[in-house]
Amino acid sequence: MTAGTVTVEQAARSLVARAQEVAVCLDFDGTLSPVVDDPQAARPLEGIVELLEPLARRFAAVAIISGRPAPYLAEHLGASGVRYLGLYGLQEVHQGQISVDPRLEAARPTVAAATAALADSLAVRESGAWLEDKIYSVAVHTRRVPDRDQWADPVDRTARQIAAEQRLELIPGKMVWELRPAVPSDKGDGVRRVVAESGARAVVVVGDDLGDLPAFAAVSQLVTEGHHGLRVAVRSEEAPPDLLAAADLVLDGPEGVLEFLRRLAA
């Protein structure tokens, strides 16, 4: 499919008709939750949570795949039957059990050193950027920084320098830079795992940021292997043009996602 080739009605009708074969993979921030200045204050849009359990019963699998820690996702969404893949698929909460890739455990001292270096850096201290310590990774947020456009380049350079010094991978996003262990994994790996483990023959991915592009790429690859796939982008003022261009369907903000999920659950 190419960008904008399907309507909400067509997509929902097709997915519901083959629900037991479909894996539904959803991002959190900017998709299920409105983007807010304080990442810790992010909450799912009202009406989202009540839909997740009915969707999990109807579809082959429902998974939340995010850069957030998996326990955070499970705590704030709390729907049973849903898989919560955090840290880009390297951590999971499923049926109340937490699993973590052992390579993340081994890298915890390195992440701690990077967190300390960021906290002590001139760019972070003077800008007022907020550090989100995820234990297995660390993120620098500038969304609530005064004159954040002025500080974007200094914070970017600092994050890249410290990532290189600690041999960590840098993942940029919308006003956020995440430093994490260079363990090969992205949202696309999470999508492929959910599809393989659920036996799904079709998959829909919904996301709003650069980190969702690998998930879109996974859908494209699965289609070449004989699966059906749908790539859904969530539009906002900050949505990456590449993501919108790669989408089969574009929804307007978490409100659009809510309406789409309501159609899938109806």
Regions inferred by a protein language model and the residue ranges of each:
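Conserved acidic, metal-coordinating active-site core of Asp-based
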Residues: 125-218, 227
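Conserved Rossmann-like nucleotide-cofactor binding loop
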Residues: 31, 70, 211
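Non-catalytic pre-domain segments flanking phosphatase-related domains
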Residues: 1-28, 32-36, 40, 47, ...
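Active-site phosphate-binding/coordination module
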Residues: 43-134
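Short, structured coil segments at secondary-structure junctions
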Residues: 77-80, 166, 227, 245-247
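Mg2+-dependent phosphoryl-transfer enzymes with acidic/Ser/Thr/Gly-rich catalytic loops
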Residues: 2-7, 19, 188-266
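The start of beta-strands in P-loop NTPase/AAA+ ATPase cores
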Residues: 22-24, 81-82, 203
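Glycine-rich phosphate-binding "P-loop"
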Residues: 32-42, 174-183
